[in-house]
UniProtKB/Swiss-Prot annotation:
GO cellular component: collagen-containing extracellular matrix; cornified envelope; cytoplasm; extracellular space; ficolin-1-rich granule membrane; plasma membrane
PROSITE patterns: SERPIN
Recorded family membership: Belongs to the serpin family. Ov-serpin subfamily.
Domain of life: Eukaryota
GO molecular function: enzyme binding; serine-type endopeptidase inhibitor activity
Family matches, as PANTHER family: SERINE PROTEASE INHIBITOR, SERPIN, SERPIN B12
Pfam families: Serpin (PF00079)
Gene3D superfamilies: Alpha-1-antitrypsin, domain 1 (2.30.39.10), Antithrombin, subunit I, domain 2 (3.30.497.10)
Tissue: Expressed in many tissues, including brain, bone marrow, lymph node, heart, lung, liver, pancreas, testis, ovary, and intestine.
Keyword Transport: no
Subunit architecture: Interacts with SLFN12; as part of a pathway regulating cell differentiation. May interact with USP14.
Protein name: Serpin B12
């Protein structure tokens, strides 16, 4: 399963570069885990070049051989069941099944809803073996709807399901024109996350403060402040600080990568984005680079909500055939040779405030005052990167860039 986590993280950075390439100054927020799982569902039923392209872009091809040499005994029964589906896609799905089960089992201290579902035109029969695999490994189903005769009803049905899965935070996933009578297969992907900080911010310490958007422009934001013990480090290679803010009981953390303050903060951010890789992220967030220090923390309150039409993004990354009616091979999903993926939409919502990610009551730990000279300052008053990680599995659940809170 470790190789799956590695593959997901590499895909995270690749996707971030693709989303942000046309605008280096916009906010970005997405869930690499949920997207990888969603595309893993498609991979389970993809064949020939359609499968190979997914493997390449999501780095699935980099771990299958290594994992099969030293198979995880916990997955022995799963692999036996998956083997009849397709050797490589079965292996990918087995590891997703284990990872998603781990996340489901231990989320009593936070809410994480990964809403993945395929909606297919009812004229296309679905292979029972594929249905069984999706339920077993991805904890979801494929729904048959009448796109041809009633696309608007289908759109409303999909939107309602997503709104329920996201506790009402994600509405109108598909706009009125997004679904039509030509639609045949839609992959729905929405994520909702809610957790409390291990050490909350006192509302009384939140103040209006300037946030440097670029070399010439500032913006007034609500800046939360806190003194406490945090894991913090400095990355000499990119001249940036890295700080860990833990959620309740430390099962998940938000890591913030903050370039050193300069005349043009965006240049520092661009340099950080260019150099970040999976291997460097592991090193930068390790105990060798980070230590617990007394920190004066200033962090902006912010809300990010975004929607990504991933068809063109994934095609630019190399996944092309599954979107092409003449080239798609999804015969593992349906025996029909005409099935192709019409649309992938990814929508996310995050709200960071004094209590945590999403508003919730919290009780803060008391930190005794120390000599002011011993405090390290971490002032996120200019653009930064952040990611939310499940610490036990090292899985990046969310990744983002804040240029304008």
């Amino acid at each position: 399963m470790d190789s799956l986590v590695t593959a997901n993280t590499k895909f995270c950075f690749d996707l971030f570069q693709e989303i942000g390439k046309d605008d280096r100054h916009k906010n970005i927020f997405f869930s690499p885990l949920s997207l990888s799982a969603a595309l893993g569902m498609v991979r389970l039923g993809a064949r020939s070049d359609s499968a190979h392209q997914i493997d390449e872009v999501l780095h699935f091809n980099e771990f299958s051989q290594n994992e099969s040499k030293e198979p995880d005994p916990c997955l022995k029964s799963n692999k036996q069941k998956a083997g009849s589906l397709n050797n490589e896609s079965g292996l990918v799905s087995c590891y997703f099944g284990q990872l998603l089960s781990k996340l489901d089992r231990i989320k009593t201290d936070y809410t994480l809803s990964i809403a993945n579902r395929l909606y297919g035109e009812q004229e296309f029969p679905i292979c029972q073996e594929y249905l069984d695999g999706v339920i077993q490994f991805y904890h979801t189903t494929i729904e048959s709807v009448d796109f041809q005769k009633n696309p608007e009803k289908s759109r409303q049905e999909i939107n309602f399901w997503v709104e329920c899965q996201s506790q009402g935070k994600i509405k109108e996933l598909f706009s009125k024109d997004a679904i039509n009578a030509e639609t045949v297969l839609v992959l729905v992907n929405a994520v909702y996350f809610k957790a409390k900080w291990e050490t909350y911010f006192d509302h009384e310490n939140t103040v209006d403060a300037p946030f440097c958007l670029n070399a010439n422009e500032n913006k007034s934001v609500k800046m939360m402040t806190q003194k406490g013990l945090y894991r913090i480090g400095f990355i000499e290679e990119v001249k940036a600080q890295i700080l860990e803010m833990r959620y309740t009981k430390g099962k998940l953390s938000m890591f913030v990568l903050l370039p050193s303050h300069s005349k043009d903060n965006l240049k520092g951010l661009e340099e950080l984005e260019r150099k970040i890789t999976y291997e460097k992220m592991v090193a930068w967030s390790s105990s060798e680079n980070m230590s617990e220090e007394s920190v004066v923390l200033s962090f902006p309150r912010f809300t990010l909500e975004d929607s990504y039409d991933l068809n063109s993004i994934l095609q630019d990354m190399g996944i092309t055939d599954i979107f092409d009616e003449t080239r798609a091979d999804l015969t593992g999903i349906s025996p029909s040779p005409n099935l192709y993926l019409s649309k992938i939409i990814h929508k996310t919502f995050v709200e960071v405030d004094e209590n945590g990610t999403q508003a919730a009551a919290a009780t803060g730990a008391v930190v005794s005052e120390r000599s002011l000279r011993s405090w390290v300052e971490f002032n996120a008053n200019h653009p930064f990167l952040f990611f939310i990680r499940h610490n036990k599995t090292q899985t990046i659940l969310f990744y983002g860039r804040v240029c304008s809170p």
